[in-house]
Amino acid sequence: MRFGESDELDAIAALQTDGFYEPVMGTRGGLTAVDGPLRAYFESDVASTLKKKYAYAKLGRFAPLVMEDENGALIGVIEVSVQRDSEVMRAMRTIEGLTVTDEYAYLSCMCVESTRRRSGIATTLIRAGESIAKEWGFNLTMLHVYENNRGAMEAYERNGFATLDRPWRTPMDVVKNQQKILMAKRI
């Protein structure tokens, strides 16, 4: 487990695209003629966003953590960042005994190479993210996950995260019939 370097952002984006891109017809519908260009655009957008976020790494407000296999290929990634969002802050007020500040540690974009899932990599990534959050002075980590992403939900629950809120659904969430869940864990 280590900090991802700036020259690896395209490789990180490729891994995240593999983990998060959804074909137009869904995962069971197969690929369509438009999936190639849409996937390429999706990966380009992920890479561009990563490069913007990476500028905050030097400030201790963003950390892309990566895990490699024995040959140096990326097999897992998690992003840790310092965030502030009014909906999350509102939900945090319900946590008994928590002193709410105006920022929180946020875990995001975690993915594991498809052939390596269910092998403990997600747990290692989560723990590394929590360690960075502690170094930054936080005692709570937050994250969002889609309710229908059972593998991720189970991994987060196994690692001590609990559902805190079910935020409002975006128009795209309604179209895709999905619900985001806000989860939290004291660290």
Question: What residue spans do the PLM features occupy?
Answer:
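Short hydrophobic/aromatic beta-strand element in the GNAT-like acyltransferase core
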Residues: 62-66, 77, 109, 142, ...
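A short beta-loop-alpha structural element at the N-terminal edge
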Residues: 1-14, 23-27
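Conserved acetyl-CoA pyrophosphate-binding loop and the N-cap/start of the following alpha-helix
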Residues: 116, 120-128
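Active-site acidic-Proline motif in GNAT/NAT acetyltransferases
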Residues: 113-115, 119, 147-148
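Conserved acyl-donor/pantetheine-binding loop and adjacent beta-alpha core of acyl/acetyltransferases
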Residues: 71-73, 79-109, 171-173
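Active-site rim helix/loop that mediates acceptor-substrate recognition in acyltransferases
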Residues: 20-64, 69-70, 74
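Conserved GNAT acetyl-CoA-binding A-motif
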Residues: 126, 133-144
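C-terminal "cap" of GNAT-fold acetyltransferases
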Residues: 139-142, 146-153, 157-187
